[in-house]
Amino acid sequence: TIPAFEEKYGIKVELIQAGTGELFKKLESEKEAPVADVIFGGSYTQYATHGELFENYTSKENDNVIKEYQNTTGYSTPYTLDGSVLIVNPDLTKGMNIEGYSDLLKPELKGKIATADPANSSSAFAQLTNMLQAQGGYKDDKAWSYVKDLFTLIDGKIGSSSSGVYKAVADGEMAVGLSYEDPAVKLLNDGANIKVVYPKEGTVFL
Protein backbone atom coordinates (compact mmCIF):
# COMPACT_ATOMS: atom_id res chain seq x y z
CA THR A 1 0.00 0.00 0.00
CA ILE A 2 2.73 2.49 0.93
CA PRO A 3 4.84 1.89 -2.24
CA ALA A 4 1.71 2.39 -4.37
CA PHE A 5 0.97 5.66 -2.55
CA GLU A 6 4.55 6.87 -2.97
CA GLU A 7 4.52 6.06 -6.68
CA LYS A 8 1.18 7.77 -7.31
CA TYR A 9 1.81 10.97 -5.35
CA GLY A 10 5.60 11.27 -5.34
CA ILE A 11 5.64 11.51 -1.55
CA LYS A 12 8.20 9.60 0.50
CA VAL A 13 6.58 7.93 3.51
CA GLU A 14 8.40 7.28 6.77
CA LEU A 15 6.59 4.58 8.74
CA ILE A 16 6.89 4.46 12.53
CA GLN A 17 5.39 1.37 14.19
CA ALA A 18 4.70 1.30 17.92
CA GLY A 19 1.98 0.68 20.48
CA THR A 20 -0.96 3.08 20.35
CA GLY A 21 -0.16 4.61 23.73
CA GLU A 22 3.45 5.20 22.70
CA LEU A 23 2.34 6.87 19.46
CA PHE A 24 -0.04 9.19 21.28
CA LYS A 25 2.74 10.15 23.72
CA LYS A 26 4.95 10.93 20.72
CA LEU A 27 2.24 13.13 19.18
CA GLU A 28 1.77 14.88 22.51
CA SER A 29 5.48 15.61 22.86
CA GLU A 30 5.67 16.97 19.30
CA LYS A 31 2.45 19.01 19.32
CA GLU A 32 4.29 22.37 19.25
CA ALA A 33 6.26 21.25 16.18
CA PRO A 34 4.32 18.34 14.63
CA VAL A 35 6.24 15.74 12.64
CA ALA A 36 3.64 13.07 11.87
CA ASP A 37 0.88 13.59 9.32
CA VAL A 38 -1.36 10.55 9.87
CA ILE A 39 -1.89 7.96 12.60
CA PHE A 40 -3.54 4.55 12.13
CA GLY A 41 -4.92 2.46 14.95
CA GLY A 42 -6.21 3.17 18.40
CA SER A 43 -9.69 3.41 19.82
CA TYR A 44 -12.44 6.03 19.65
CA THR A 45 -11.82 6.91 23.31
CA GLN A 46 -8.19 7.78 22.64
CA TYR A 47 -9.09 10.10 19.78
CA ALA A 48 -12.01 11.68 21.61
CA THR A 49 -9.72 12.71 24.47
CA HIS A 50 -6.88 14.00 22.27
CA GLY A 51 -8.73 16.17 19.78
CA GLU A 52 -6.28 19.04 20.22
CA LEU A 53 -3.58 16.96 18.50
CA PHE A 54 -5.39 16.74 15.17
CA GLU A 55 -6.62 18.92 12.33
CA ASN A 56 -10.20 18.62 11.16
CA TYR A 57 -10.66 16.27 8.22
CA THR A 58 -13.78 14.53 7.01
CA SER A 59 -13.63 12.35 3.90
CA LYS A 60 -15.90 13.30 1.03
CA GLU A 61 -17.13 9.70 1.19
CA ASN A 62 -18.24 9.99 4.82
CA ASP A 63 -21.94 10.15 3.94
CA ASN A 64 -21.63 6.84 2.08
CA VAL A 65 -20.50 5.04 5.23
CA ILE A 66 -23.01 3.28 7.49
CA LYS A 67 -24.16 5.92 9.97
CA GLU A 68 -22.82 4.14 13.06
CA TYR A 69 -19.30 4.13 11.57
CA GLN A 70 -19.08 7.64 10.18
CA ASN A 71 -16.55 10.23 11.29
CA THR A 72 -18.35 12.00 14.14
CA THR A 73 -15.40 13.80 15.76
CA GLY A 74 -14.45 15.79 12.68
CA TYR A 75 -10.87 14.50 12.77
CA SER A 76 -10.90 10.69 13.21
CA THR A 77 -12.16 8.30 10.55
CA PRO A 78 -13.08 4.71 11.52
CA TYR A 79 -11.48 2.29 9.07
CA THR A 80 -11.84 -1.17 10.56
CA LEU A 81 -13.68 -3.30 13.11
CA ASP A 82 -11.60 -5.80 15.04
CA GLY A 83 -12.75 -8.26 17.66
CA SER A 84 -10.98 -9.46 20.78
CA VAL A 85 -9.85 -13.08 20.54
CA LEU A 86 -7.73 -15.55 22.48
CA ILE A 87 -4.78 -16.92 20.55
CA VAL A 88 -3.82 -20.37 21.84
CA ASN A 89 -0.73 -22.52 21.30
CA PRO A 90 -2.08 -26.11 21.22
CA ASP A 91 1.29 -27.67 22.12
CA LEU A 92 1.46 -25.67 25.35
CA THR A 93 -2.19 -26.16 26.33
CA LYS A 94 -2.60 -29.91 25.92
CA GLY A 95 -5.32 -31.23 28.19
CA MET A 96 -6.80 -27.76 28.67
CA ASN A 97 -10.11 -26.76 27.13
CA ILE A 98 -9.78 -23.04 26.51
CA GLU A 99 -13.03 -21.61 25.19
CA GLY A 100 -13.27 -18.29 26.99
CA TYR A 101 -12.11 -15.99 29.75
CA SER A 102 -13.26 -18.26 32.56
CA ASP A 103 -10.89 -20.96 31.27
CA LEU A 104 -7.85 -18.74 31.72
CA LEU A 105 -7.91 -18.93 35.53
CA LYS A 106 -5.96 -22.17 35.59
CA PRO A 107 -2.94 -22.39 37.93
CA GLU A 108 -0.95 -24.16 35.22
CA LEU A 109 -1.22 -21.04 33.03
CA LYS A 110 0.59 -18.82 35.53
CA GLY A 111 3.22 -16.82 33.70
CA LYS A 112 2.12 -18.27 30.36
CA ILE A 113 -0.55 -15.75 29.36
CA ALA A 114 0.62 -12.96 27.07
CA THR A 115 -0.91 -9.49 27.11
CA ALA A 116 0.09 -5.94 26.37
CA ASP A 117 -0.46 -2.97 28.68
CA PRO A 118 -4.03 -1.58 28.34
CA ALA A 119 -2.60 1.90 28.94
CA ASN A 120 -0.39 1.64 25.85
CA SER A 121 -2.14 -0.83 23.54
CA SER A 122 -5.58 -0.34 22.01
CA SER A 123 -6.05 -4.10 21.58
CA ALA A 124 -5.17 -4.70 25.25
CA PHE A 125 -7.61 -1.95 26.23
CA ALA A 126 -10.26 -3.64 24.08
CA GLN A 127 -9.53 -6.93 25.85
CA LEU A 128 -9.96 -5.26 29.24
CA THR A 129 -13.25 -3.81 28.04
CA ASN A 130 -14.34 -7.19 26.72
CA MET A 131 -13.54 -9.20 29.85
CA LEU A 132 -15.22 -6.66 32.12
CA GLN A 133 -18.36 -6.76 29.98
CA ALA A 134 -18.23 -10.56 29.93
CA GLN A 135 -17.96 -10.77 33.71
CA GLY A 136 -20.74 -8.32 34.56
CA GLY A 137 -19.73 -4.82 33.48
CA TYR A 138 -17.49 -1.96 34.53
CA LYS A 139 -19.34 -1.35 37.80
CA ASP A 140 -19.43 -4.98 38.89
CA ASP A 141 -17.02 -5.85 41.70
CA LYS A 142 -16.91 -9.48 40.54
CA ALA A 143 -15.75 -8.34 37.10
CA TRP A 144 -12.85 -6.40 38.59
CA SER A 145 -12.09 -9.33 40.87
CA TYR A 146 -11.75 -11.49 37.75
CA VAL A 147 -9.34 -8.96 36.21
CA LYS A 148 -7.27 -8.99 39.41
CA ASP A 149 -7.15 -12.80 39.43
CA LEU A 150 -6.19 -12.92 35.76
CA PHE A 151 -3.38 -10.41 36.12
CA THR A 152 -2.10 -12.32 39.12
CA LEU A 153 -1.72 -15.31 36.79
CA ILE A 154 -0.14 -13.12 34.12
CA ASP A 155 2.52 -12.66 36.79
CA GLY A 156 3.86 -9.29 35.70
CA LYS A 157 4.67 -10.44 32.17
CA ILE A 158 3.05 -7.50 30.40
CA GLY A 159 4.38 -6.68 26.94
CA SER A 160 4.89 -3.24 25.44
CA SER A 161 2.95 -3.86 22.23
CA SER A 162 0.14 -5.96 20.78
CA SER A 163 2.43 -7.54 18.18
CA GLY A 164 4.56 -9.07 20.90
CA VAL A 165 1.51 -10.92 22.24
CA TYR A 166 0.57 -12.92 19.16
CA LYS A 167 4.20 -13.46 18.16
CA ALA A 168 5.01 -14.94 21.59
CA VAL A 169 2.19 -17.48 21.26
CA ALA A 170 3.00 -18.37 17.66
CA ASP A 171 6.68 -18.80 18.56
CA GLY A 172 5.85 -21.13 21.44
CA GLU A 173 7.04 -18.75 24.15
CA MET A 174 3.58 -18.30 25.70
CA ALA A 175 0.54 -20.59 25.90
CA VAL A 176 -2.27 -18.08 25.47
CA GLY A 177 -2.44 -14.49 24.27
CA LEU A 178 -5.04 -11.76 24.69
CA SER A 179 -5.05 -10.55 21.11
CA TYR A 180 -7.29 -9.35 18.29
CA GLU A 181 -8.75 -10.97 15.22
CA ASP A 182 -6.85 -9.58 12.24
CA PRO A 183 -3.24 -10.61 13.02
CA ALA A 184 -4.35 -13.83 14.72
CA VAL A 185 -6.27 -15.01 11.67
CA LYS A 186 -3.41 -13.95 9.37
CA LEU A 187 -0.98 -16.08 11.41
CA LEU A 188 -3.41 -18.99 11.25
CA ASN A 189 -3.77 -18.67 7.48
CA ASP A 190 0.02 -18.50 7.14
CA GLY A 191 0.32 -21.88 8.85
CA ALA A 192 1.22 -20.90 12.41
CA ASN A 193 0.64 -23.55 15.06
CA ILE A 194 -2.14 -21.69 16.86
CA LYS A 195 -5.87 -21.74 17.50
CA VAL A 196 -8.00 -18.60 17.36
CA VAL A 197 -10.70 -18.65 20.04
CA TYR A 198 -13.66 -16.29 20.16
CA PRO A 199 -14.50 -16.17 23.89
CA LYS A 200 -17.67 -18.10 24.71
CA GLU A 201 -18.74 -15.15 26.87
CA GLY A 202 -18.86 -12.99 23.74
CA THR A 203 -16.48 -10.61 22.03
CA VAL A 204 -16.57 -6.87 21.48
CA PHE A 205 -15.70 -5.47 18.06
CA LEU A 206 -14.21 -1.98 18.33
Model regions: which residues?
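Extracytoplasmic ligand-binding site segments that recognize negatively charged/polar headgroups
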Residues: 1, 18-22, 28, 34-173
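Short, structurally constrained coil/turn elements
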Residues: 7-9, 32, 109, 190
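Generic structural signal for residues in well-ordered beta-strands
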Residues: 13-15, 113, 194-196
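Conserved beta-strand termini and adjacent loop/short-helix elements that scaffold enzyme active sites
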Residues: 16-18, 116, 179, 199
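Periplasmic-binding protein-like
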Residues: 146-151, 158-159, 190-206
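Short, catalytically relevant binding-site loops at active-site mouths
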Residues: 165, 182-186, 201-204
